[in-house]
Amino acid sequence: MSRPLLITFTPATDPSDLWKDGQQQPQPEKPESTLDGAAARAFYEALIGDESSAPDSQRSQTEPARERKRKKRRIMKAPAAEAVAEGASGRHGQGRSLEAEDKMTHRILRAAQEGDLPELRRLLEPHEAGGAGGNINARDAFWWTPLMCAARAGQGAAVSYLLGRGAAWVGVCELSGRDAAQLAEEAGFPEVARMVRESHGETRSPENRSPTPSLQYCENCDTHFQDSNHRTSTAHLLSLSQGPQPPNLPLGVPISSPGFKLLLRGGWEPGMGLGPRGEGRANPIPTVLKRDQEGLGYRSAPQPRVTHFPAWDTRAVAGRERPPRVATLSWREERRREEKDRAWERDLRTYMNLEF
């Protein structure tokens, strides 16, 4: 049985396709193009003719504007890393354009790579001394410094001069993460690398260096310390005074345990604290065994205990049994099947050799 073809309905997408009051709306006429190729050509020819017939004074006024735009585009194309290589570069280059600073950086890097000490001194000496006042830690677009170029080229004299003037190398790396000493070693100049590493190479000012921790005295431990973690150390926690403790307080450790015997052998008396002068905590710190790989707080923590296993209990040193892999199980099953087949064959041969 054939079904009649259904008429598909296409929704209107244009206001002119709509029907209004039983009548279809008229189609709007397409606007004709008011500009053809000949008219556009005539317009541009007239524009060019007006520029060529302009007076010389107007042309001289437009040329500096074009030159300024061209210079502005050339400056904007310079890498931002070269413009703000370091804060010191900005201080040394005050009053100097970015383009001049870029040229100065390349001159310094080239002089350092070629080992030209007179040119290097002229570029790095301050203006008061008759030099160019260049930055000794200037960087190019690849973050190479003069010290890196001199070390990579094996120019020992230039490296010694730059280090003597305070060139930084500690923590100063190029884009690949290599410093001046590593570049010298890769190029086959171990003497230059050793010269760099034996220098100071401090990149931080003295006021920004982290102060050395001062020596402090702990009354509870009766000792001097410099470590900031001393307050949370086990020795300090055991020495903390918890007030007078009754002498018959149970220690929580059996008398037969090796730890208790070591305490007695060291001069400790039962009922006294565990500190250096027999004061502080009288009981050991309870602990919780951690023998799984689950994260902390994954399950509720068990009860802390001082002694987890009785004496001579092998569970104290027993490791966690590793479940066998699938390959190991398959290999064992195969060995068991082969052994069973060999036993069956042996029994069969024995049975057939019997004489009744």
UniProtKB/Swiss-Prot annotation:
It comes from the Eukaryota. Residues 77-88 have a biased composition (Low complexity). Coiled coil: none annotated. One of its GO terms (molecular function) is nucleic acid binding. There is a cross-link at residue 290 (Glycyl lysine isopeptide (Lys-Gly) (interchain with G-Cter in SUMO2)). The keyword Protease does not apply. Residues 255-301 form the G-patch domain. SMART domains: G_patch. Residues 54-63 have a biased composition (Polar residues). Residues 1-98 are annotated as: Disordered. It holds the Pfam family Ank_4. It comes from Homo sapiens. Gene3D superfamilies: Ankyrin repeat-containing domain. This is G patch domain and ankyrin repeat-containing protein 1. The lineage of its organism: Eukaryota, Metazoa, Chordata, Craniata, Vertebrata. ANK repeats lie at residues 111-141, 142-172.
